[in-house]
Each structure stands twice: as structure tokens, then as C-alpha cells.
């Protein structure tokens, strides 16, 4: 039972946490900057002593001792009003938004550092690109990214991000903006500066950069559909649509670059069966905006709770997941789609009452995952995890995912090499097991190449003359060398992973 079920009483101030409770909560936030502190607890199987375990345990204690009421916490990163139930957080922020009492939200890292978020702008539901037309839009950029794989089939983060940002500009702004990398840089600068003194200058630069695309919109893009929607209703114009386009581009860019890669990792380990469930699970488990702070600029009352101006409301859905009856280890239900919209804080935006641009970004991510998996099979190289033990945090920049061609078939009479160069590229900074996984993948590729060479040598077309027989011997010799190399690499990989 949440406070939403309680009868209204006279308004009163939120209860303050005790000094020891503040100290434990602060220590848990500081520890988020030290990922290695989880290693001893995980090695002993004591998940309750990890950073997230301690935080959730403290929140469960506060929820019991405060009857589920929001509590005022004091930390080295500032005082926060923390709702202890997801329903309470949603209700409190909705009431504040309705009263016009909220300043724009800022993001909060796990270690307590604040960062700018793209200012939320409503996006008309019927202005989004229809799902049926999204299938064709990502194809060209997905093919470019797949072609940019390294020799061992893995993806370089910079190449992946560059390709996904191209795709995002194509879908949101139009074909003319695909090569406009400066647009992405200006957008990133404006987003990071949100809420600071330099924001207006950066926002003006972003408006200038978007102006040509708004003046001559691509009808197949989100911008074209948004302007057509506004003109059909006699509303606004190109300049009025600029903030909505910028917000949608920021969210789609992040979903395509980060969430899609996480979804591919989930598919690789069998933690999701379809692109829709993979994207939904990635956004649920590792939301790009995992925590947000909402400054209150005017007094308001939510039920019997009086919230004063100057208060900062902290909303962290991940911490409350287990407390609200949803197990932290549960997966998204089969058939779930993040694009359908779910109650609670949008995973890509800190809007207090939902965000249509987030739903559109999730839909784009689903189509990108579908386009990738229609051509290649994702293989997780590092970090290592399994479907039944997914990590609490997963930085997409640390993911090493290999893409294996679906069309490659060993021993079919043709020489099949996935990529022109089959030289593995080391993953600097990873554990020996990660190098071992790369070596295993290289050994498998060498073995397949040896099999395809042997199958090619067995073709009857070489029987027609002396030159054919001589060339067959060359093929067989090369196949033998590849097989021997595969055995050697596999032995080395075994030593690395043992």
C-alpha cells in the first residue's frame, strides 16, 4: 500500500532521515564511484553487501520505518526528497508539474555527479514516422556499420557510435543531415550545458544549425512529418518545431548508440528472444537516464505532504524496483515493447509525466536491432555475463560485441571468409578471459576457413587437368596450415580462460 491509498490529512513537512541513515546513504552513493568494491561480496555470493544491495537494503529499511512516506535525506551531493515507492514518485512529480512548480530536471550519476539533460518538449503522437516505414530507413547505415567491423568481427565503439549517429540524423532530420557531424556536436554541447549559464548561447547555435533542415524538411523524416502535422493544424512553424526536433534527435541518438548495443548483448547471451524484448529489457535494466533531480521552484502540496520551494526531488526507478514487488533480476515479459510506453520515469528523458520522443526512440532502436540481427549474429566477447546473472550496470562503451555473418556456411564447396583481414585486434585493458574469448572466436574462424578450403579442393572441377590438380594441392596445404593454426590458437585461448 502506497501513500496514494491513504486518506488526506493536514499538510505536513517530509520526515527527515536520522544522521546514521544519511551517512549510510551517502557512503553508498560515494561507493558507486568505486566499482571494484563489489568484487569481494560477489566472490562470496553476498549480493546484499554490494553497492546496489546496500542501497536497496537501506531504502527498504526507510520504507518500513517511515510507513512508505517520502523522506528527506542529506548527502555530500545535496539534500534530496526521496520518494520510497515508484507510484509515489510518479504522483508527486505529476502534482508538481500540474502546479507548475518544477524547474527543468538534471541527470545524476551513480556517484552523485550532475549532468545536463535534453530539455523535454512534447512530441505529437501522430507526428512520428510510422513503424512500417522505419524498416527501410536504417538499412544503409546498418550495412555501413557491419562493413566497418574489425578483423575479428568485433565493433570499434567509435565506428559504431559514428554510424548510429548518422542513422539518427537520417531518421529524425532527413537525408540532407546524414553527413552533418557538426549538428551532432552542437547538439551534444547544448545538452551538456542545459541548466548552465552557457546554455542559451549553445541553444542558439543549435537553432541556427537546424534552420536549413526545418526550412526544407525531408518528408520521410520525423522533422517533415512534424512540420506537416503542425501546418495541417495551423500551428507554429519551422522555428517552433526546432526544440521538439532537437529533443527527439538527442533521444534517438542515445538509444541507437547505447541501447541497441546493450540489446545485442542481451540477445547474444539469450536473455531476450526478440528485438522488442531486448530493447525493452535494456532500457528497463540500464536506462540511459537512471536517476534525475527535480528542483522545486514553488510550494505545492501532494496529498498531505507539503513540499517547499528549494526542495530537490530525487527519482531513481532502479533502486525502487525490488521494493515495489518487481524483482531486480526479473526480465521484461515476453512480447514487451518499450515503444508502447510504460508507467514511471521515461528511461531516456526526465519528463515528470511521460515522453512521446522516448517511445519513438525505443521504436527506432527496435528496428535497428531487427536490421542488425537480420544480417549477422551478435556474439558477446566482453564483459562476460550470462542470461541468469546480468550485471547491475553496463556501460555500452565497455561492451565488446562481435557480429558473425549468418550467410557464412562451412564446407559448402566455396571459400568463405567473413572479412578480408582475419587478424584479431586486441581489446586493450580487458581481463585475460576477454582476450581468451577473442582468441576462441579467431580459432573458430580459422577452423571454418580450413573447412571451406578443403571443401573447395574437393570440387570435381579441378580434375580436368594438371594445373587443376596442382592448385588443389595448394588449397589442401593451405587448409592444413589453417587447421594447425586453429589448434594452436585454441590451446592459447584455453590457457587464458582457465
Indicate residue ranges for each PLM-predicted region.
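Conserved cytochrome P450 K-helix E-x-x-R motif and the immediately C-terminal K′/meander segment
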Residues: 51-63, 273-305, 315-324
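Cytochrome P450 catalytic core segment centered on helix I
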Residues: 182-239
Amino acid at each position: 500500500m502506497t501513500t496514494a491509498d491513504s486518506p488526506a490529512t493536514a499538510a505536513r513537512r517530509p520526515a527527515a532521515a536520522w544522521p546514521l541513515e544519511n551517512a549510510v546513504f551517502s557512503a553508498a552513493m560515494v561507493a558507486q564511484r568505486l566499482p571494484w568494491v563489489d568484487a569481494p561480496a560477489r566472490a562470496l555470493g553476498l549480493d546484499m553487501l554490494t553497492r546496489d544491495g546496500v542501497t536497496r537494503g537501506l531504502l527498504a529499511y526507510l520504507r518500513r520505518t517511515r510507513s512508505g512516506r517520502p523522506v528527506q535525506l542529506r548527502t555530500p551531493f545535496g539534500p534530496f526528497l526521496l520518494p520510497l515507492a515508484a507510484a509515489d514518485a510518479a504522483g508527486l512529480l505529476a502534482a508538481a508539474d500540474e502546479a507548475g512548480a518544477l524547474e527543468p530536471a538534471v541527470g545524476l550519476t551513480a556517484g552523485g555527479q550532475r549532468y545536463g539533460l535534453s530539455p523535454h518538449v512534447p512530441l505529437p503522437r501522430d507526428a512520428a514516422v510510422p513503424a512500417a516505414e522505419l524498416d527501410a530507413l536504417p538499412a544503409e547505415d546498418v550495412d555501413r556499420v557491419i562493413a566497418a567491423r574489425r578483423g575479428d568481427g568485433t565493433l570499434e565503439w567509435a565506428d559504431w557510435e559514428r554510424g548510429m549517429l548518422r542513422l539518427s540524423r537520417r531518421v529524425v532530420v532527413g537525408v540532407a543531415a546524414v553527413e552533418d557531424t557538426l549538428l551532432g556536436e552542437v547538439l551534444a554541447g547544448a545538452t551538456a550545458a542545459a541548466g548552465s549559464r552557457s546554455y542559451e548561447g549553445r541553444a542558439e547555435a543549435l537553432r541556427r544549425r537546424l534552420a536549413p533542415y526545418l526550412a526544407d524538411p525531408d518528408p520521410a523524416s520525423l522533422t517533415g512529418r512534424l512540420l506537416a502535422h503542425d501546418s495541417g493544424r495551423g500551428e507554429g512553424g519551422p522555428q517552433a518545431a526546432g526544440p521538439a526536433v532537437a529533443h527527439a534527435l538527442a533521444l534517438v541518438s542515445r538509444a541507437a548508440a547505447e541501447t541497441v548495443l546493450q540489446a545485442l548483448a542481451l540477445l547474444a547471451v539469450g536473455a531476450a528472444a526478440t528485438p522488442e524484448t531486448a530493447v525493452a529489457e535494456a532500457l528497463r535494466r540500464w536506462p540511459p537516464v537512471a536517476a534525475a533531480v527535480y528542483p522545486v521552484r514553488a510550494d505545492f502540496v501532494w496529498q498531505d505532504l507539503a513540499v517547499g520551494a528549494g526542495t530537490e526531488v530525487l527519482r531513481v526507478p532502479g533502486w525502487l524496483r525490488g521494493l515495489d514487488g518487481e524483482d531486480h533480476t526479473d526480465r521484461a515479459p515476453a512480447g514487451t515493447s518499450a515503444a508502447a510506453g510504460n508507467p514511471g520515469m521515461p528511461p531516456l528523458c526526465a519528463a515528470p509525466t511521460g515522453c512521446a520522443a522516448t517511445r519513438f526512440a525505443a521504436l527506432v532502436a527496435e528496428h535497428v536491432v531487427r536490421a542488425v540481427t537480420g544480417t549477422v549474429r551478435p556474439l558477446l566477447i566482453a564483459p562476460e555475463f550470462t542470461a541468469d546473472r546480468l550485471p547491475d550496470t553496463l556501460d555500452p562503451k565497455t561492451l565488446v560485441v562481435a557480429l558473425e555473418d549468418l550467410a557464412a556456411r562451412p564446407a559448402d564447396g566455396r571459400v568463405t571468409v567473413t572479412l578480408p583481414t582475419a587478424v584479431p585486434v586486441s581489446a586493450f585493458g580487458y581481463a585475460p578471459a576477454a582476450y581468451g574469448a577473442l582468441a576462441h572466436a579467431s580459432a573458430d574462424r580459422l577452423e571454418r576457413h580450413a573447412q571451406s578450403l578443403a571443401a573447395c579442393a574437393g570440387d570435381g572441377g579441378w580434375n580436368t587437368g594438371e594445373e587443376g590438380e596442382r592448385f588443389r594441392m595448394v588449397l589442401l596445404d593451405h587448409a592444413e596450415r589453417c587447421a594447425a593454426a586453429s589448434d594452436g590458437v585454441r590451446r592459447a585461448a584455453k590457457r587464458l580462460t582457465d
